[in-house]
Amino acid sequence: MIALHFGAGNIGRGFIGALLHHSGYDVVFADVNETMVSLLNEKKEYTVELAEEGRSSEIIGPVSAINSGSQTEELYRLMNEAALITTAVGPNVLKLIAPSIAEGLRRRNTANTLNIIACENMIGGSSFLKKEIYSHLTEAEQKSVSETVGFPNSAVDRIVPIQHHEDPLKVSVEPFFEWVIDESGFKGKTPVINGALFVDDLTPYIERKLFTVNTGHAVTAYVGYQRGLKTVKEAIDHPEIRRVVHSALLETGDYLVKSYGFKQTEHEQYIKKIIGRFENPFISDDVTRVARSPLRKLGENDRLVGPAKKIKEPNALAEGIAAALRFDFTGDPEAVELQALIEEKGYSGVLQEVCGIQSHEPLHAIILKKLNQ
């Protein structure tokens, strides 16, 4: 039972590949990094270490790999035989692997069902990949593929820190993980994936992750940067920053509980668990890395402004947004662009243009007040 996984990077090996291996699949990685492909085929296994006290580890194997750029015939053969295809290549790379997957689907000569799951840090990753794949197929081919191939969306969550290992195949991951899959998107029988959660509606889980993990991480980083702190761990250990982060997550939590019916006590435990992840001393994450791409993260539907617009009194979120607007790290192109926009249009103009917060909205005034404090 073959699982073909696109992306032999840290998340592919340390998260998705490991879970598929534990679920009984023969995992084959597809990647264009020839060094990684050769190493996986030479060693046929790799080590996954948990970033926690004691640093327990396990061997994942046997596994194999192919170069999806040069071994296209082998790729198409595997696609014909695979029971499951997954990806962890990054949102921007999905469109690059779509032509090869389209050709593999075009050549499939089996009536067996196949499901393709994009495990990316984006909303609707599988739907996006499907759209990209279908752009390389004729209408008749699309109809044929749609009869046997499913594209269930999923939400994934696991922190994979910067790696410092002599063994290039070894990967450290945090103990916590979450892989939630929309069961309604499958063709045929739902596959066995140990550790995954299958749900009828993915939206509550996507928003819970985005408005808790991503929001909390961003507020920690932006406020921490303003305080001159270097790492997420240092930032969340600062009492005032911790208060702001916790308050922001209580604000988003109120919206999530009311909108999706999460139990209040369970969601409070979820918030506690998420803040505990930021406190993990075995994960070193610079605030400048977590805070990068402020233009995207200040978007109207993203982790800061998105929930703030849905809440009556988003004071802590407004503080996080104000800190994000002040993010001036010269090593990040978006931060440089953001500061240039502020210089040109002022905070009010940027709130309207970048954040979609118009001058008549109460949130606009709340954020400006925070910026003037």
Curated annotation (Swiss-Prot):
GO terms for biological process: mannitol catabolic process. It catalyses: D-mannitol 1-phosphate + NAD(+) = beta-D-fructose 6-phosphate + NADH + H(+). NAD(+) binds at A3, L4, H5, F6, G7, A8, G9, N10, I11, G12, R13, G14. The keyword RNA-binding does not apply. GO terms for molecular function: mannitol-1-phosphate 5-dehydrogenase activity. InterPro entries: 6-PGluconate_DH-like_C_sf (IPR008927), 6PGD_dom2 (IPR013328), Mannitol_1_phos_5_DH (IPR023028), Mannitol_DH (IPR000669), Mannitol_DH_C (IPR013118), Mannitol_DH_CS (IPR023027), Mannitol_DH_N (IPR013131), NAD(P)-bd_dom_sf (IPR036291). GO terms for cellular component: cytosol. Keywords: NAD, Oxidoreductase. Its EC number is 1.1.1.17. PROSITE patterns: MANNITOL_DHGENASE. Belongs to the mannitol dehydrogenase family. This is Mannitol-1-phosphate 5-dehydrogenase. The lineage of its organism: Bacteria, Bacillati, Bacillota, Bacilli, Bacillales. The gene is mtlD.
